Design a protein with these regions (language model features):
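Catalytic Tyr-X3-Lys loop
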Residues: 1-11, 32, 49, 56, ...
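Residue(s) in the substrate-gating loop at a strand-loop-helix junction
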Residues: 36
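Active-site loop-to-helix junction immediately N-terminal to the catalytic Tyr of the SDR YXXXK motif
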Residues: 42-50, 62, 86
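Active-site loop immediately N-terminal to the catalytic Tyr-X3-Lys motif
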Residues: 41-47, 69-70, 107, 125
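Alpha-helical segment proximal to the catalytic Tyr-Lys
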Residues: 19, 65-69, 128
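Short, flexible catalytic-loop segment of classical short-chain dehydrogenase/reductase
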Residues: 40, 57, 74, 78-89
Length: 144
């Protein structure tokens, strides 16, 4: 299930989007994949999820290089835990919440706005020289 959702879907959608971008007279564009901080670091008990997010990061790098000559940029946004209803459910487990927050030097989870702002930046002309990389929104987790 996670492989289909996190990797195959991203690959298939990107392929369709690239075909549309190549037909567009303006040429070029920006593809933004959703990854996770766990595409940059491992976490016990999350092996399949880690694998799929590392896969998205690899896909992004490969496509970023391959499509650069077509003026198509490919990047990822890789957040930590984001304040959503799903994360709120996870955080009802006090041990899990403490473990997660203790790994985030800033001591808080990301907001939906934090993620949306990064996506808007990558989609904008301000990011015209950024491709094949990831913006990690994790409060310092992966910097440790």
């Amino acid at each position: 299930y996670l492989v289909d959702l996190n990797m195959k879907a991203a690959f298939n959608v990107a392929q369709l989007v690239v075909l549309k971008m190549l037909k567009n007279k303006k040429k070029g564009g920006s593809i933004i994949n959703m990854s996770s901080q766990l595409g940059h670091v491992g976490m016990s008990g999350r092996n399949i999820y880690n694998m799929t997010k590392f896969g998205i990061e690899g896909l992004t790098k490969g496509m970023g290089v391959e499509l650069a000559t077509k003026n198509i940029r490919v990047n990822t946004v890789a957040p930590t835990f984001v304040e959503t209803p799903m994360v709120k459910k996870f955080f009802k487990n006090k041990k899990f919440k403490q473990l997660a927050l203790s790994n985030i030097p800033m001591g808080k989870v990301a907001t939906e706005s934090d993620v949306a702002t990064a996506v808007c930046f990558l989609a904008s002309d301000a990011a015209s020289m950024i491709t094949g990389t990831s913006i990690v929104i994790d409060g310092g987790w992966t910097a440790k």
